[in-house]
Amino acid sequence: MSTPNLYDSTNKPLYGERLIEESKIICFDNPNKKRIYEISIELPEFTCKCPFSGYPDFAKLNIFYQPNSKVYELKSLKLYINHFRDLKISHEEVVNRIMDDLLNAAAPHWIHLNADFNPRGNVSMKLDIYSGQKRN
């Protein structure tokens, strides 16, 4: 009895890798533009790599926002976030890049991006970025 080959022997990217590589943030129309409401999204498995050591960095990202005319589509957001997993980038740069991309994709009234990086070498880091004015 032979064991099935779980890896693509042609070295082509697997379908999940292709989806991540091609990812972009997709939005859809806000279903209730007249109502002021807040959406929170938790992404607990964010990863990127330290630009100095190459070691992986892990974080939980939290996005809180008040939509304007567009709302983030969650699967596209998940794939977009996953494309950072092999990128060598500082915490500060990656969080600012994500915030820029979120703003460009949906232009929410207000947004708060929180990144809580796991400790490495007995040091942890949290970043918070805000944009816009919260509406009541």
UniProtKB/Swiss-Prot annotation:
GO terms for cellular component: cytoplasm. The active site is at 50 (thioimide intermediate), 57 (proton donor). It is found in: Cytoplasm. It catalyses: 7-aminomethyl-7-carbaguanine + 2 NADP(+) = 7-cyano-7-deazaguanine + 2 NADPH + 3 H(+). One of its GO terms (molecular function) is preQ1 synthase activity. Its EC number is 1.7.1.13. GO terms for biological process: queuosine biosynthetic process; tRNA modification. Keywords: Cytoplasm, NADP, Oxidoreductase, Queuosine biosynthesis. Pathway: tRNA modification; tRNA-queuosine biosynthesis. InterPro entries: GTP-CH-I_C/QueF, NADPH_dep_7-cyano-7-deazaG_red, QueF, QueF_type1. Substrate binds at residues 72-74, 91-92. Belongs to the GTP cyclohydrolase I family. QueF type 1 subfamily. Catalyzes the NADPH-dependent reduction of 7-cyano-7-deazaguanine (preQ0) to 7-aminomethyl-7-deazaguanine (preQ1). NCBIfam families: QueF-II. This is NADPH-dependent 7-cyano-7-deazaguanine reductase. The gene is queF.
